Amino acid sequence: MSLIKELAVVHGRVVLSSGQEADYYIDLRRVTLHRHGGPLVGRVLLDVCAGWSFDAAGGLTLGADPVGAAMLHASGGAIDSFVVRKAEKKHGMQRRIEGPDVAGRRVVVVEDVSTTGASPLTAVEAARAAGAEVIGVALIVDRGAGDTIRAAGLECRAAYTLADLGLA
């Protein structure tokens, strides 16, 4: 949590991807792509997912990309990672999900930080359309999305809340 407070929390007026305005921004890419933060994120998210049986972790690009990869590495090869594109490619194999095939597999959708739940729920929809069984959503920081994700019938767990970071 200290790396998040030190590297990721930026104070100042910002517009979030949800369109909402806020007095601070949590830029977790500063942690997930950091030489010390990335490996730690993988271990922490695997702990968050304890008790869930799953084969792969991934989510909507870009925030989820390093999170899924960190979990893959921290698992010692026990799980795969996947990336959900915002839109299907118009060339090549025209895939929406990159990485190992998720069809018939139990997956966890991950996200670095979520305010409204829109990104993880978009990834859930894409994973299900590709034939995956989504068993839950795991967030590094729940900025308020947990209730929306649970209302969609999914279990949602987070490593940290705004209160944990002293932001609530």
Pin down the residues of each PLM region:
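Conserved acidic residues
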Residues: 55, 105, 135
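Short, glycine/charge-rich flexible loops or terminal/linker lids adjacent to PRPP-binding catalytic cores
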Residues: 65-108, 115-121
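Active-site-facing substrate-recognition patch
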Residues: 1-52
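Short loop/turn motifs at secondary-structure junctions
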Residues: 53, 77-78, 131-133
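PRPP-dependent phosphoribosyltransferase catalytic core
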Residues: 2-6, 125-168
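Short, well-ordered alpha-helices that flank and scaffold nucleotide-derived cofactor binding pockets
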Residues: 47, 69, 73, 125, ...
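Short glycine-rich phosphate-binding loop at a beta-alpha junction
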Residues: 52-63, 138-139
